[in-house]
Swiss-Prot record:
GO biological process, one term: coenzyme A biosynthetic process
Protein's name according to its UniProt entry: Phosphopantetheine adenylyltransferase
Residues given in the record as ATP binding sites: 9-10, 17, 88-90, 98, 123-129
UniProt xrefs under InterPro entries: Cyt_trans-like, PPAT, Rossmann-like_a/b/a_fold
Function noted in UniProt: Reversibly transfers an adenylyl group from ATP to 4'-phosphopantetheine, yielding dephospho-CoA (dPCoA) and pyrophosphate.
Organism of origin: Pseudomonas putida (strain W619)
């Protein structure tokens, strides 16, 4: 069974992330969205809420599971029996970091391959950072995130 692990902070999960998950769900038997705690990134949403939002966005995909984690990614992949890391590349600027990450993961978990997918053109410019900035300034984010995520962002920035 091919099990792919799609790691990220997902703060918040965007339509770009969703696009990659949908496509991965057609390519792999089982997709694990691995939501990283990432305390050094100081996420807007707590881990539990990011996991819940990702579950809501992907609930229509029967072979997709969402799990939060706070361990080393290589260890988490082994625990989950994953044999592939899925990473998205929006632009050439993403490549250098992702290349370093793939090489480090290969050293830590040589049995897990790294696979890169590019998002659909209509989502290639979306990032969680931009979505948070637009939401914080009261902009319309409905084109970039699932309605439940837009609602959570709107609620978060009301405070």
């Amino acid at each position: 069974m091919n099990r792919v692990l799609y790691p990220g902070t997902f703060d918040p999960i965007t339509k770009g992330h969703g696009d990659l998950v949908e496509r991965a769900s057609r390519l792999f038997d089982h997709v694990i969205i691995a939501v990283a705690a990432s305390p050094k990134k100081n996420p807007l949403f707590p881990l539990e809420q990011r996991v819940a939002l990702a579950r809501e966005v992907t609930k229509h995909l029967p072979n997709v599971e969402v799990i939060g984690f706070s361990t080393l990614l290589a260890h988490f992949a082994k625990e989950q029996g994953a044999n592939v890391f899925l990473r998205g590349l929006r632009a050439v600027s993403d490549f250098e970091y992702e290349f370093q990450l793939a090489n480090m993961n290969r050293q830590l978990a040589p049995e897990v391959e790294s696979l890169f997918l590019t998002p659909s053109e209509r989502y290639s410019f979306i990032s969680s950072t931009l979505v948070r900035e637009i939401a914080a300034l009261g902009g319309d984010i409905t084109k970039f995130v699932h309605p439940v995520v837009a609602e959570a962002l709107t609620e978060r920035f009301k405070k």
